[in-house]
Amino acid sequence: MQNTAKKATLPATALAALGVVFGDIGTSPLYALKESFHAAHGLGIQPENVLGILSIIFWCLMLIISIKYVAIVMRADNNGEGGIMALLALNLRKAKIADNKKIYMIAIGFIGASLFFGDGIITPAISVLSAVEGLSIATDVFDPFIMPIAIAIIVTLFLVQKHGTAFVGKFFGPITLVWFLSLGILGIHSVIQTPVVLGMFSPHWAIQFIYHHPIMTFFVMGAVVLTVTGGEALYADMGHFGPVPIRLAWFFVVLPCLVLNYAGQGALLLRDPAAIENPFYLLVPQWALYPMIIMATMATVIASQAVISGVFSLARQAIQLGYLPRLSIKHTSESEEGQIYVPFLNWLLLIAIIILILIFKTSSNLASAYGLAVTLTMLCDTILVAVFIYSAWKWSLPKVLLLIIPFFILESVLVGATSLKILSGGWVPLLIGAIAVTILMTWKRGRELTFAKLEHDTLSLDLFVKSIGNSVHWVPGDAVFMTGTPNVVPHAMLHNIKHNKVLHQRNILVTVVIEDVPFVAPEERITTETLAEHFFRIKIFYGFKDEMNVPKALMQAYEQLGLEYDLMHISFFISRDRIVHSVGDGMSPWREKLFISMQRNTSPVSDFYQIPTNRVVELGSQIEI
C-alpha cells in the first residue's frame, strides 16, 4: 500500500478519498431516479411506485455497496491493493487451478478490466452532460449550447492531463464534501415537507412493487443500477487510501447524503409528479440553481478525473503484467508515484467521449449505454472474489456459495435488465469491451508464442558460456543485454558477435520479472548469478504498480556482485524483434496481424525502463510465430 493513508490522519485521508473514490457514485443523483421513471417504462408516478423504487434503490445501495464491496470485496486485497487486475493476479497466484483452466479466470478478469475502459469513456460523457443539462431548467436559452458546453469542459479536462492534478487534486476532497453535504441538505429540506417518503427504508415497499409489477421491475432495475455506478472504485482505490478511510467516508458521509437526496427527490415527486422532468434540479431553490449547476459541474469533472486516472492506472498494471503492449507513460508528480499520464490513452478517450456525446446528445440517452458496463463489471468482481474466498480464505464450497449466490442472482438480474437496452445504447460498452478483450488476449497469446519460439530456437545460455572460450575478441566495458528469456542467448548478443566479432569484458543478462503483487520490497528487488568469468545473470523483480528503473536497480545488483558501477561505461544492448507470420500452429491470421501491428508500435524498451538513450544499442532480429 502506498503511504498516503499512513502519513495523513484518518479524517484527512477519508476527506481525500471522497474526491477520488466517490466522485462517480456521488453524481448518480443527477440522473438515476429520473431514469427509473423513464417514459418508455410506462410507470405511473403514484405514491406506491415512488416508495417502491426508492426502497429498491436503498436496498441495492446496502446490498451491493455496503455489504458486498465494503464488507466483503475490500477484504480481498493483494498486499493492500484492490481492483480487478490486482484480484486476478492474486487469484492466479493463490488459486489451486490447473493451468488449462486458468484461462477462464483470466478471461473473466480481462472482461471486467475491458469494461472498466468502457466506463472511462461513458462516465465523463454522461456525468458532465447531466450537470450541464441543469441550465435548461433555468432557461430555454441554453438548450442549443448544452452539448457544446459539455464538449468544451471535456476537452479542457483532457488537455490538462499532461500537467497532472497534483495541485488542484488537493481541492477535490473538500469540493466533493461540499457536494455531498449539498445533496444531503437538499434532501432533508424536501423530506421534512413530505415525511411519508421515509417509508422507503422498509423493504416491504420494494417487495410489494416487485410483486405487483414483476415485468416492469425488470425494466426499472436497468435504471436503478445507475445508483450504484462507481461501486468498483471503492475496491480499486483501496491501495491509495486504505480500507478504513474509505469505509469511514462511505458510512458517515456518502451513504447518508445519497439516501437523503434520493428520498428528497422522491418526496418532491409525491408532491409534484410533473417534477419527473428533472427531479434533481427541481429540488434546488430557484436562487441556488446556478450555484448548484456550477457545483454539479465541478463534481462531475472530479468524478471524470477519478475515472480517467483509474484507466491510466489500470493500463499501467496491464502493461506490467504483460497483458498490454508497452505504451509511453509519463509521471506528472515527483512526490506521488501513482500520478501518471498515458498520452495515447488520453487522446483515445477524448475522441471516443466526443463521438459518444455527438451520437447520444443527452444524458438520458447515454443512460442506456452506462448500466450494462457497470453490471457486467460487478458480476466479474463477484466471480473472482468467490474464487479468492475459496482458495485464500479456505472456506468450504457450500459456505462460499451461500455467501456469493445472493449477489450473483441480484447482479445477474441487473445484467439481464440492462441487456434489454443493447439496441438503444448498451452496444457501446459491449463493443468497447470486445475490442479491449481482443487486444488483451491477442497480446498475451502473442507474447507466449514469441517467448516459446525464442526458447526453442535459440542456443542455451549455459552451453554458450561453456563453449565460448577464447574464440572471440574481448573489449573493455560492460554490455547489458535486456532479455525476456534468461536461459537462452539473447538475439542481441548473437548479432553483436556476428557483426562486430567481439564481446565485452563483462556481459550481463538482465531480465525484468513482474510479480503478482503490487510492490516488491527493495531487499527482494535483485537476484544475481555469476555464470562464468565474463558472464553474469541478473533478475530484477517489480510489482505491477512499481515504477521500473533498470539503471537504478543495476546499481544495487552491481553492489551485490562486488562490481564497480559506472553508467557511462555500460552499453545496453536491446533486441528489436520483428515478428513475421509462419505456417503452423499459433494464432489465426487476423490475430497475428493485430499482434504484429501492436508489436511494431510499442514504446521503446529504453523509455519504458528509463534507460538513457545515449547508452542504448538496438539490434534487429526476426521471429516467426
From Swiss-Prot:
The chain crosses the membrane at residues 13-33, 53-73, 103-123, 141-161, 172-192, 206-226, 250-270, 282-302, 340-360, 369-389, 400-420, 422-442. GO terms for molecular function: potassium ion transmembrane transporter activity; symporter activity. It holds the Pfam family K_trans. InterPro entries: K+_transporter, K_trans_C, K_trans_N, Kup. It is a multi-pass membrane protein. It is found in: Cell inner membrane. It catalyses: K(+)(in) + H(+)(in) = K(+)(out) + H(+)(out). It comes from the Bacteria. Keywords: Cell inner membrane, Cell membrane, Ion transport, Membrane, Potassium, Potassium transport, Symport, Transmembrane, Transmembrane helix, Transport. GO terms for cellular component: plasma membrane. Its main location: membrane. HAMAP family: Kup. Belongs to the HAK/KUP transporter (TC 2.A.72) family. Transport of potassium into the cell. Likely operates as a K(+):H(+) symporter. This is Probable potassium transport system protein Kup. The lineage of its organism: Bacteria, Pseudomonadati, Pseudomonadota, Gammaproteobacteria, Moraxellales. The gene is kup.
